[in-house]
């Protein structure tokens, strides 16, 4: 999978995506990250990417021109469609014959979850546009992107932070990213789990007087599986009761 991230703050994305599992996934050619500065697609000497909103209001709005230019340059298109057609066909909705899925990180988007991550992990190419300021010109949403996505009901400094969370959740589902493929299935929120993951323990078996539950040391796999299921249900009931019944 190829993932292009278009942002005003590329360094926010580079560091976390070059560590741990994301670094190994790139080294194994599981995923290919490309991080771009939106200002590279501006045409004025000051590299302006925002302007005041029509109708007045607080803050600034991201201009459509550099966003359209960036996405059109990065989109994987059907080879039957020449680049000259792209530049001459100025007024149109969406990019024709496109193979890429275009995402806008925005607090007004659909709330991201594990099922959406699994669905998007089937794509071959994602282009992620990171919002900033008071948002983007609405023509970007109407005529360019495929999905607006929010990672939660809170406001971040910029969309680059959200983009890192977004691509990490997707890339770890790609075959070859994790050391144990079953790990992604057993995680909380996975498509095969209706709630949260249960508690985990490791050595030592006793720490400051707190002991690991005996069942985990018993070697009885059926009882261990039963205990884990019960504990997962208990944790879900206590922390996320809204998840109960989703997988039934």
Protein language model annotation of sequence segments:
Residues 4-6, 34-36, 103, 126-127, ...:
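Hydrophobic/aromatic beta-strand patches that form the interior of the parallel beta-sheet core
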Residues 37-48, 114-117:
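Short, hydrophobic/aliphatic alpha-helical segments
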Residues 42-43, 50, 54-69:
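A short aromatic-anchored loop/beta-hairpin motif
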Residues 106, 182-198:
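A short beta-strand-loop-alpha-helix capping motif that often carries His-Thr
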Residues 136, 140-184, 189:
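Structured adenosyl-cofactor binding patch, chiefly the S-adenosyl-L-methionine
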């Amino acid at each position: 999978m190829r993932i292009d991230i278009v942002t005003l703050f590329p360094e926010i994305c580079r560091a976390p995506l070059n560590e741990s599992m994301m670094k190994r996934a790139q080294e194994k050619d599981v995923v290919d990250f490309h991080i771009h500065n939106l200002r590279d697609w501006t045409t004025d000497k000051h590299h302006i990417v925002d302007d005041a909103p029509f109708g007045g209001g607080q803050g600034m709005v991201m201009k459509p021109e550099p966003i359209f230019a960036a996405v059109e340059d990065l989109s994987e298109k059907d080879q039957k469609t020449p680049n000259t057609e792209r530049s001459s066909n100025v007024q149109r909705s969406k990019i024709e014959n496109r193979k890429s899925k275009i995402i806008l990180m925005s607090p007004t988007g659909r709330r991201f979850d594990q099922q959406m991550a699994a669905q998007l992990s089937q794509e071959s190419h994602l282009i992620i546009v990171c919002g900033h300021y008071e948002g983007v010109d609405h023509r970007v949403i109407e005529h360019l992107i495929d999905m607006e996505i929010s990672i939660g009901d809170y406001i971040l400094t910029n969309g680059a932070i959200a983009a890192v969370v977004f691509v990490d959740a997707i890339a770890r589902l790609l075959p070859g990213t994790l050391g144990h493929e079953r790990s992604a299935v057993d995680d909380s929120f996975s498509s095969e789990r209706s709630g949260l993951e249960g508690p985990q323990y490791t050595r030592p078996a006793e720490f400051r007087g707190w002991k690991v539950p005996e069942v985990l040391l018993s070697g009885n796999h059926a009882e261990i599986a039963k205990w884990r299921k019960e504990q997962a249900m208990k944790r879900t009931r206590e922390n996320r009761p809204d998840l109960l019944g989703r997988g039934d």
